[in-house]
């Protein structure tokens, strides 16, 4: 059982590493999007709802739709914070 447990944990560690890389890439894209936004509006609830609705449709489990929603709201919120920091820095720099 210990070997199997170790193997499963190693698989989870590998997945976590990949997830972190993907989330970091998402954050970089959010920063880039922040630079391209002309209207200065960082939070667009309709876009967040669109992203989450699409993910729920793709969800095949085992996580519940509520779990997927909670996870992605946290990811989106933290990526939005990157956009906001960039927007504030841009405004201060160009005043």
At which residue positions do the language-model features occur?
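Domain-level signature for soluble enzymes in the chorismate/prephenate branch of the shikimate pathway
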Residues: 1-95
